[in-house]
Amino acid sequence: MENKNTENISLESKLYTAEEVATILGVSKTTAYREIKRLNAELEAQGYITITGKISKRFFNERAYF
């Protein structure tokens, strides 16, 4: 059985936080939360489970223009 801390580290390394998204896009944290919410809605429509305030790095990098 895996250690819960190891599982969290693995999951966290696959997600961006709103603060990280704000830095990447050069926007405020509020705007980053808004964009994460919009992107998470797309993922939910495709049947994925999402975490509020976080976004998959892979999905974000595919969708972001930078």
PLM features: what roles do these ranges have?
Residues 1-5:
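Short, Lys/Arg-enriched anionic-surface-contact patches
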Residues 7-8, 47:
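Short, functionally important structural connectors and interaction interfaces within domains
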Residues 9-31:
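Polyanion-binding surface elements
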Residues 25-65:
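Major-groove DNA-recognition helix of helix-turn-helix-type DNA-binding domains
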